């Protein structure tokens, strides 16, 4: 036991710890007295180089007088804490409170590069092509629903709209003329409406006919006639048929005259 105590007592004569807490948490290099102006000058030199590069690039894109020349741009540091900078000609002397804001605004007003402008133009062209394609598809659908003459070339958009207006007016006139003929007591309104295809007569037209020399054309007519009255009957009717006219001939009406038309045969589905 005494031997053990003697060994423990010998620890008191052990030298100080291998490292001090201050040495462990503190860098020896930081103990050296450094001048704050040295750090400030290094930062100012770094910023001056960056801004000189920026103004050198901006001078190529801009020719305005409000941009400083990169060669005449200089920084000066002082112990007052400010960061004044000035141009060689004295035209860009700014107060310390407006330095950062002015630089940011000039960066925002910088012109886009050629690559960015090319991308914007390509995107605008794609949007315009899609818009025109949608318009062309809509006109193709409209042409497919309007009875037209066998033109040598496709109708233009203006002619297509004129034909559509004439056809809609014709259908509206047919509906309005048929309303007084309806019997309110009959149930013909509940019957399905049918579109009947009408053809010109098979007789040879005379030279006095307005359609002499033209091929027979198909028109469209609407019928709400009660089919019960037409059972077991061979009915031949004539009706006003809308014949598509050339929209480029403005002196002609899109409505055909019933007196000048040959008899029309209505093929009724009995």
UniProtKB/Swiss-Prot annotation:
<dbReference type="InterPro" id="IPR050283">
    <property type="entry name" value="E-box_TF_Regulators"/>
</dbReference>
<dbReference type="GO" id="GO:0048384">
    <property type="term" value="P:retinoic acid receptor signaling pathway"/>
</dbReference>
<dbReference type="GO" id="GO:0005634">
    <property type="term" value="C:nucleus"/>
</dbReference>
<dbReference type="GO" id="GO:0005737">
    <property type="term" value="C:cytoplasm"/>
</dbReference>
<dbReference type="GO" id="GO:0006355">
    <property type="term" value="P:regulation of DNA-templated transcription"/>
</dbReference>
<protein>
    <recommendedName>
        <fullName>Pancreas transcription factor 1 subunit alpha</fullName>
    </recommendedName>
</protein>
<dbReference type="GO" id="GO:0003677">
    <property type="term" value="F:DNA binding"/>
</dbReference>
<dbReference type="Pfam" id="PF00010">
    <property type="entry name" value="HLH"/>
</dbReference>
<comment type="function">
    <text>Transcription factor implicated in the cell fate determination in various organs. Binds to the E-box consensus sequence 5'-CANNTG-3'. Acts together with pdx1 to induce the pancreatic lineage within the endoderm. Plays a central role in directing the differentiation of retinal progenitors towards horizontal and amacrine fates.</text>
</comment>
<dbReference type="GO" id="GO:0048699">
    <property type="term" value="P:generation of neurons"/>
</dbReference>
<feature type="domain" description="bHLH">
    <location>
        <begin position="119"/>
        <end position="171"/>
    </location>
</feature>
<dbReference type="GO" id="GO:0005667">
    <property type="term" value="C:transcription regulator complex"/>
</dbReference>
<dbReference type="GO" id="GO:0009888">
    <property type="term" value="P:tissue development"/>
</dbReference>
<dbReference type="GO" id="GO:0030902">
    <property type="term" value="P:hindbrain development"/>
</dbReference>
<dbReference type="InterPro" id="IPR036638">
    <property type="entry name" value="HLH_DNA-bd_sf"/>
</dbReference>
<dbReference type="GO" id="GO:0031017">
    <property type="term" value="P:exocrine pancreas development"/>
</dbReference>
<keyword id="KW-0805">Transcription regulation</keyword>
<keyword id="KW-0539">Nucleus</keyword>
<dbReference type="GO" id="GO:0046983">
    <property type="term" value="F:protein dimerization activity"/>
</dbReference>
<dbReference type="GO" id="GO:0045893">
    <property type="term" value="P:positive regulation of DNA-templated transcription"/>
</dbReference>
<dbReference type="GO" id="GO:0000981">
    <property type="term" value="F:DNA-binding transcription factor activity, RNA polymerase II-specific"/>
</dbReference>
<dbReference type="GO" id="GO:0032502">
    <property type="term" value="P:developmental process"/>
</dbReference>
<keyword id="KW-0804">Transcription</keyword>
<dbReference type="GO" id="GO:0000977">
    <property type="term" value="F:RNA polymerase II transcription regulatory region sequence-specific DNA binding"/>
</dbReference>
<dbReference type="GO" id="GO:0006357">
    <property type="term" value="P:regulation of transcription by RNA polymerase II"/>
</dbReference>
<dbReference type="InterPro" id="IPR011598">
    <property type="entry name" value="bHLH_dom"/>
</dbReference>
<keyword id="KW-0238">DNA-binding</keyword>
């Amino acid at each position: 036991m005494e031997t053990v105590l003697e060994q423990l007592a010998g620890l008191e004569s052990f030298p100080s710890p291998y490292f001090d807490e201050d040495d462990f948490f503190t860098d020896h290099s930081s103990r050296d007295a450094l001048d704050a102006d040295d750090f400030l000058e290094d930062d100012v030199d770094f910023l001056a180089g960056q801004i000189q590069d920026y103004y050198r690039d901006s001078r190529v894109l801009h020719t305005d007088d409000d941009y400083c020349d990169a060669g005449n741009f200089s920084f000066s540091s002082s112990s007052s804490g400010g960061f004044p900078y000035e141009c060689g000609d004295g035209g860009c002397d700014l107060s310390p409170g407006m330095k950062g804001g002015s630089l940011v605004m000039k960066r925002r007003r910088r012109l886009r590069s050629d690559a960015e402008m090319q991308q914007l133009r390509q995107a605008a062209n794609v949007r315009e092509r899609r818009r025109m394609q949608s318009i062309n598809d809509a006109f193709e659908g409209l042409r497919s629903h309007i009875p037209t003459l066998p033109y040598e070339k496709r109708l233009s958009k203006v002619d297509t709209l004129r034909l559509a207006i004439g056809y809609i007016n014709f259908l509206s006139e047919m509906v309005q003329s048929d309303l007084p003929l309806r019997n309110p007591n009959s149930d013909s309104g509940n019957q399905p409406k049918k579109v009947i295809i009408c053809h010109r007569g098979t007789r040879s037209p005379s030279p006095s006919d307005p359609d002499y020399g033209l091929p027979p054309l198909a028109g469209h007519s609407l019928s709400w006639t009660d089919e019960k009255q037409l059972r077991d009957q061979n009915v031949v009717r004539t009706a006003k048929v809308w014949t598509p006219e050339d929209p480029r001939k403005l002196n002609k009406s899109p409505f055909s005259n019933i007196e000048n038309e040959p008899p029309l045969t209505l093929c009724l589905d009995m």
